[in-house]
Amino acid sequence: MKGSNTFRWAIAIGVVVAAAAFWFWHSRSESPTAAPGVAAQAPHTAAAGRRGMRDGPLAPVQAATATTQAVPRYLSGLGTVTAANTVTVRSRVDGQLIALHFQEGQQVNAGDLLAQIDPSQFKVALAQAQGQLAKDNATLANARRDLARYQQLAKTNLVSRQELDAQQALVNETQGTIKADEANVASAQLQLDWSRITAPVSGRVGLKQVDVGNQISSSDTAGIVVITQTHPIDLIFTLPESDIATVVQAQKAGKTLVVEAWDRTNSHKLSEGVLLSLDNQIDPTTGTIKIKARFTNQDDTLFPNQFVNARMLVDTEQNAVVVPAAAVQMGNEGHFVWVLNDENNVSKMRVKIGIQDNQNVVISAGLSAGDRVVTDGIDRLTEGAKVEVVEPQTTMADEKSPSRHEGQKGARA
């Protein structure tokens, strides 16, 4: 049994050794033909790569020409719309509110009737004052007649000088009483007039603060309604203290500074007004000063407490060199642009910028009118490289075509 097992192991080992020897001989016989093929392929690939780099397409870019323009200079700040006047309408007399003569949100004019207090008690008080005045006027008339008689009798010594003086004093006293009566009549008339509550200013009324039937008094703080004057309307915004000198100089030069109100996103112009005044002190916590501008607001585009972006035109720079904002780049050395020569070679040019907005930038130094600058395709540029200047629509087609050709090559492969 032991001898048969040893024989089987010897056969298995022999088979394995024979298989290994066959594989080694077969691999050695194929390697001399495969190696030359690989070696021949490598030079071909390298040559193809060099040929592709040498014959590759030029980098497509878009370009614009520097021009001269009259560029406005704006000072910008954040602001809030405020009513030119805000008035809380209160009653000046105590009484029962019997009528409201306005609709909430209505535009009213100064002097329009807004509310009515029950006038009954004030009419009674006026009638009493008028009655007392009439009574004292009759007393004065009688005293004056007696004084005239006393004066005639005094000439014949039928009355004493003392009696004449006493009658004169009575006349004077009655005249004083009448003056007081006239004041009482005027006061009663005023109380009656005040029972009719009118609009002190023109503007838009808000929501009513009290309903008809309530007893109101002059001490009520909430009042009856609030009127906000929106024609005209004001805008209060802030500017850095470094801009104060510019604004003051423009005012001293007699310029009317135009202020534009833009919406919250700064994308839509709402209205246009003029500078009204500057505050008399700087806020030490923010280093800013408050500016007030006034707008006619006839179209009601501005509303009290509305948040807006303010832009104030302070000057206009004439013959300024202007390029699109997309052409100006920022690097370690500062602002620069890529300039194109007549042969469409690009070179980096350092520039000094001035006034700028979302679309254009004023170049204070480094460029002249007529220079061509790259506005798109900048990330593919190197110093001295030759480029292909294309139109915007051409650039879009060129950007799509390589991917399409690559897809076709991949399909064939």
Swiss-Prot record:
Residues 1-20 form the signal peptide. Keywords: Cell inner membrane, Cell membrane, Membrane, Repeat, Signal, Transport. Disulfide bonds: none annotated. GO terms for molecular function: efflux transmembrane transporter activity. Residues 397-413 have a biased composition (Basic and acidic residues). Its main location: membrane. It is a peripheral membrane protein. One of its GO terms (cellular component) is efflux pump complex. Residues 31-57, 392-413 are annotated as: Disordered. It holds the Pfam family HlyD_D23. It is found in: Cell inner membrane. HAMAP family: MdtA. Part of a tripartite efflux system composed of MdtA, MdtB and MdtC. Belongs to the membrane fusion protein (MFP) (TC 8.A.1) family. This is Multidrug resistance protein MdtA. The gene is mdtA.
